Regions:
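Short, ordered loop/turn segments at secondary-structure junctions
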Residues: 11-14, 39-45, 79-80, 111-114, ...
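Glycine-rich oxoanion-binding loops at beta->alpha junctions
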Residues: 49-106, 113, 144-158
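N-terminal phosphate-binding or glycine-rich loops at protein starts, especially the Walker A/P-loop
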Residues: 2-51
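Short glycine/serine/threonine-rich phosphate/pyrophosphate-binding segments
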Residues: 15-25, 46-47, 88-92, 106-119, ...
């Protein structure tokens, strides 16, 4: 079947790089004499196409009105999973909606849940290609949004040290990432956090406190004005002592059926506060540094900050802009090769790499050997530091790099 019209869908959470996917898709399609249309409101918009009066065509003039340097999506989002819709004829309804507008294929950008819907649509005869998007970075290939989010986390961690140092506070920053710790890990390192707690590592609270006490006290005692702070970056999917994720039970579930992760930062603050309160050395330290006031100021302040949606908003960083453009463009190329139900993984020159979407959306966790390297550099990851004895290999020619 010759493709004449492509619909573009962005789904799930917003982040940096999505406008680059939209633009890359549209610009490549234009080069191939194919029209592109934005299907608004994610999968909700796809389901409701039959009742939609018109779609916005992404002409060269229209796509010139928005920037790939801005996060978010010109196409709009919703968190709707098609398989959760009760209508038994939902896929027939979607096909009728696509037929109404003459749309032959779809480019769909999103994370694991979005990818699972790509599989469903493909299995029902709807040609579609998945452009990976999630700031959580928990897919097998790189996904749009990751680098932009990591940079924003690093910025917030670094900036919060000024208020932390002014008040000699322990600062806890809780960040997104669901059940993978990539953004907390990389953002925490780049922001020079003292401690980084991720779902992949069960927390040893004694080890966290040992590191905090040593670093915090040393930092303040060595300051000529007795000023210092200690920063902890916490992934939202952190597990409690029984190995269960920490949920905000009052928040319910989202439309994909996931419990809303929340409260990890508060949980860490409670654990730290308990240990500070029970430690006689802390009272002595507070007295020696002129901070102690009976009944009023007996332990260092512990504050929790949740930047929340600020880490997915604002500006798209250069890598996400580049990757998003190529992911969108190559999604078109894959469609033109007759492929469907696959995920764009990247390209090298004129070679486009892809994998089956069911493989691409398998959860990818932090490589703990990478964590071990950073433990040698002084970062605490909530466990006893592991040894790091790398194997060294000689190489030649081009090696993998981001640019």
């Amino acid at each position: 079947m010759k493709i004449q019209k492509i619909g573009i869908i962005t789904s799930g959470g917003d982040c940096g790089g999505l406008n680059a996917v939209v633009k890359g898709t549209s610009q490549m399609a234009t080069q191939k004499k194919i029209q592109t249309y934005a299907i608004p409101n994610g999968y909700a918009g796809l389901y409701n196409l039959l009742d939609t009066e018109s779609l916005v065509e992404l002409t060269p003039k229209r796509i010139d009105t928005f920037s790939i340097g801005l996060a978010g999506s010109e196409a709009g989002h919703s968190r709707v999973k098609i398989s959760k819709i009760k209508n038994p004829k939902k896929y027939e309804r979607i096909k009728d909606g696509l037929k109404k507008f003459g749309i032959d294929a779809l480019v769909i950008s999103g994370g694991d849940d979005t990818g699972s819907v790509v599989e469903d649509l493909d299995s029902h005869g709807i040609q579609c290609v998945h452009a990976p998007k999630t700031m959580d970075l928990d897919l097998m290939p790189y996904s749009v949004g990751g680098d932009s989010t990591i940079n924003r986390i690093a910025f917030f961690v670094s900036e919060l040290k000024t208020t932390g140092r002014t008040h000699n506070r322990v600062m806890i920053i809780e960040v997104f990432g669901r059940y993978a710790g990539h953004t907390a890990f990389r953002g925490g390192v780049a922001g020079e956090a003292d401690c980084i707690l991720i779902p992949e590592i069960p927390v040893d609270w004694d080890e966290v406190y040992r590191h905090l006490k040593k670093v915090y006290i040393k930092r303040i005692c060595e300051s000529d004005i007795r000023a210092g702070t200690y920063t902890i970056v916490v992934a939202e999917g952190l597990k409690n002592s029984s190995g269960e994720p920490i949920y905000d039970e009052s928040a319910g579930v989202d439309t994909f059926g996931h419990k809303k992760l929340a409260g990890a930062g508060k949980y860490v603050a409670q654990e730290i506060t308990k240990k500070l309160s029970a430690d006689e050395d802390i009272k002595l330290f507070m007295e020696q540094t002129g901070m102690y006031v009976e009944d009023l100021y007996t332990i260092p302040e512990v504050r929790t900050i949740t930047p929340s949606h600020l880490v997915r908003a604002g500006t798209t960083l250069a890598y996400d802009a580049n990757f998003g453009m190529t992911a969108g463009a190559n999604a078109v190329n894959l469609l033109l090769k007759g492929l469907s139900g696959v995920t764009v993984c990247g390209n090298s020159g004129k070679t486009v790499y892809y994998m089956e979407t069911h493989e691409a959306i398998k959860q990818r966790h932090v490589d703990l050997d990478e964590v071990t390297l950073f433990e040698q550099l002084g970062f605490c990851f909530g466990r006893v530091r592991s040894s790091y004895e790398p194997e060294c290999k000689k190489t030649s020619g081009p090696i993998e790099r981001i640019y």
